[in-house]
């Protein structure tokens, strides 16, 4: 079994669609091994997204991610990283395949509902950024 990391972003929490996202996650066969609702500080968002610090969207991304609560999740499934990325869909909801979370629930490239690890290395950084080993079941 592989683990991946997911965030239900502030736009989804604000629109009260977190339950719809969680239904899709469980419906796709993922086991939720860690979950909590948190309100990131801008500094915490900057630490999490440090790999993008030189990108022009970095400041706006960190401001967005810290504007309201998020739900962070550790997910488990065979080939979890690829499976979660497929379920999320393309970053821009306009380009995402029908039936994906971002196509069906995303608003824009900025407010695209969910985040997911893009590699085993990312998951290895992202999961412990938010969860201690005692918080994962």
UniProtKB/Swiss-Prot annotation:
Gene Ontology process terms (BP): CTP biosynthetic process; GTP biosynthetic process; UTP biosynthetic process
Ranges in a coiled coil: none
Names of the cofactor(s): Mg(2+)
Domain of life from the UniProt record: Bacteria
One Gene Ontology term, aspect cellular component: cytoplasm
Localization of this protein: Cytoplasm
Binding positions for ATP per the UniProt entry: 9, 57, 85, 91, 102, 112
Keywords attached to this entry: ATP-binding, Cytoplasm, Kinase, Magnesium, Metal-binding, Nucleotide metabolism, Nucleotide-binding, Phosphoprotein, Transferase
EC identifiers of the protein: 2.7.4.6
Catalytic activity line of the entry: a 2'-deoxyribonucleoside 5'-diphosphate + ATP = a 2'-deoxyribonucleoside 5'-triphosphate + ADP; a ribonucleoside 5'-diphosphate + ATP = a ribonucleoside 5'-triphosphate + ADP
InterPro entries: NDK-like_dom, NDK-like_dom_sf, Nucleoside_diP_kinase, Nucleoside_diP_kinase_AS
Residue numbers annotated as active site: 115
Membrane-crossing segments per the record: none
SMART domains for this protein: NDK
Predominant location category: cytoplasm
SUPFAM superfamilies noted in UniProt: Nucleoside diphosphate kinase, NDK (SSF54919)
Quaternary structure, from the entry: Homotetramer.
Reported function: Major role in the synthesis of nucleoside triphosphates other than ATP. The ATP gamma phosphate is transferred to the NDP beta phosphate via a ping-pong mechanism, using a phosphorylated active-site intermediate.
Family according to the record: Belongs to the NDK family.
Protein's UniProt name: Nucleoside diphosphate kinase
Organism: Geotalea daltonii (strain DSM 22248 / JCM 15807 / FRC-32)
Gene coding for it: ndk
């Amino acid at each position: 079994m592989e683990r991946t990391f997911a965030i239900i972003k502030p736009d989804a929490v604000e629109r009260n669609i977190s339950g719809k996202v969680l239904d899709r996650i469980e419906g796709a066969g993922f086991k939720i091994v860690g979950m909590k609702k948190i309100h990131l500080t801008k500094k915490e968002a900057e630490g999490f997204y440090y790999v993008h610090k030189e990108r022009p969207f970095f400041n706006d991304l960190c401001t967005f991610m810290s504007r309201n609560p998020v739900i962070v999740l550790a997910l488990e499934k065979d080939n979890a990283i690829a499976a979660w990325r497929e379920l999320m869909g393309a970053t821009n909801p306009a380009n995402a395949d029908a039936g994906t979370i971002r196509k069906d629930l995303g608003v824009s490239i900025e407010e695209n509902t969910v985040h997911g690890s893009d590699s085993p290395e990312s998951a290895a950084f992202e999961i412990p950024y938010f969860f201690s080993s005692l918080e994962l079941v």
